Amino acid sequence: MPHIALQTDVPGIRGLAMFRPETAKPLYDLAQVLQRGESPLSEAERELIAAYVSHLNDCMFCMNSHAAAAKCLYGSDKNIVDDALHDMQQSAVSDKLKALLHIAGRVQVLGSAVTQQDIDAAKNLGATDKEIHDTVLIAATFCMFNRYVDGMATMTPTEQNEYAAMGERMAKGYVPPTP
């Protein structure tokens, strides 16, 4: 049950967006730029980073919804998402993406936990400064989103088919709901 009077039938951040549309717009704009804007990282990779950080934060709504978006974007390679969330090191994601996910995991713990060694390892595997930048910003942003969603105890669906529908919508872009 949400900690404040939210529409109980609107899950996660969408319920919060409907409660405060004036704060929703800049948050959705940021998500749109990070997840769908220009980046050397694919949209699928960016959604996987969001899902991975949300998984580490134990934010079930964000993890499931962004994993669903990543699956839509990965298409026939969608199993890579569950594999990476289950055991990133043994998954079929590229070594470069594993290094970037490692950095995202460091950000999730504490921003200053990212070391020059982490950055050098990613660069040695081909990561660019922009890919590293985007990874850190996505990880930091989703830590905030996770804390916002869970800190307000928003409604979290338990049925995976609800997340599949969310993932399809999110794969097309981030548009705030209207009250």
What name fits each language-model region?
Residues 1-179:
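Hydrophobic alpha-helical segments
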